[in-house]
Amino acid sequence: MSPCAVVVGPPGAGKTTVGRLLAERLGVAFRDTDDDVVRVAGKPIAEIFTGDGEPVFRAMEERAVAAALAEHDGVLSLGGGSVLSERTRALLAEQPVVFLSVGLAEGARRTGLSTARPLLAGVNPRATFKALLDARLPLYREVATWELATDGVEPDALVDRIVERVTADRAAGRE
């Protein structure tokens, strides 16, 4: 069993929104590994970061991704930092991965000063977001089967493009 699509990207790219719409359109279940981590930890991600530290969160995230890839056959959305794990990137190598990219200005606008996004809650969220994009962009591209820019594109239009690609790959026997 493996997901029909795995959605990755930085914070604010629309992973959860697009993932839910995609699952609905394909008639499959949706799963978000951030939700899995919160359920297992019994507390929000921001509290895990502040109380336990980022390394503890990343270990929990890595386990959640591995479990979801093994158990879930619908659409799977991963946390923005999940690609930092070498193990996770290796597991994604054989998966249909959709990388939702977002530009600096749009990403900073979408994420703002959200305290729910602990890595972006600093003094200068735009500079923090740029550093995050610079560090992660090569990793997102490493795991991506497809890359779709989200700036100025409605979620439904993104889903249309993903459905076309997933359907074409299924027809060609590349699931």
From Swiss-Prot:
Enzyme type, top EC level: transferase
Its UniProt entry gives the catalysed reaction(s) as: shikimate + ATP = 3-phosphoshikimate + ADP + H(+)
Q: Where in the cell is it found?
A: Cytoplasm
InterPro entries, from UniProt?
P-loop_NTPase, Shikimate/glucono_kinase, Shikimate_kinase/TSH1, Shikimate_kinase_CS
State which gene encodes it.
aroK
Locate the residues binding substrate: 34, 58, 80, 136
Q: Which HAMAP family match?
A: Shikimate_kinase
Q: Which domain of life is it from?
A: Bacteria
Primary location: cytoplasm
Q: Does the keyword Transport apply?
A: no
This chain belongs to the protein called Shikimate kinase
Q: What is the lineage of its organism?
A: Bacteria, Bacillati, Actinomycetota, Actinomycetes, Pseudonocardiales
Say what the protein does: Catalyzes the specific phosphorylation of the 3-hydroxyl group of shikimic acid using ATP as a cosubstrate.
Residue numbers binding Mg(2+) = 16
